[in-house]
Amino acid sequence: MLVLVVFVSFLVHLYSMDYMAGDPHIIRFLGYLSLFTFFMLMLITAGNFVQLFLGWEGVGLSSYLLINFWYTRVQANKSAMKAIIVNRFGDFGIYFSLLVLFFCFKSFDFGVIFNLVDLVYLQSPINIFNFAINRVDFIVFFLFLGAIGKSAQLGLHT
């Protein structure tokens, strides 16, 4: 995944430098693009959920900055605001899953969580409105909601 992200980022930077060659704000644009790449690399190389979360939030922030690059254009402002609102929906899923994850595992480290997942799966389920939901399934559901929000899927796109 690391090689893929670096390769695609290289191609995007190369294309952007040619496309934006005459723009007086190319330095700002390439800074935003590099920031996006940095946070994406942080996201995919994370060793724990805290680092993953910081990368996740950074990707959202840098996406907003890139979408709103030409901030004097009304449509760019509207699109950026819409993107940040949709991202907030996804972030709710991540926030909530991390809260439950720490409650169940007492750790954010991937290794600890992956070693304990079978034990937590066997624990008593969480009862919500008389429905018994397994703790791991509950966490995975909200992580999935976070991914849906970040990629603007299932009713969050227009």
Outline where the language-model segments fall:
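...captures the hydrophobic TM-helix bundle architecture rather than a specific catalytic motif
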Residues: M1-T158
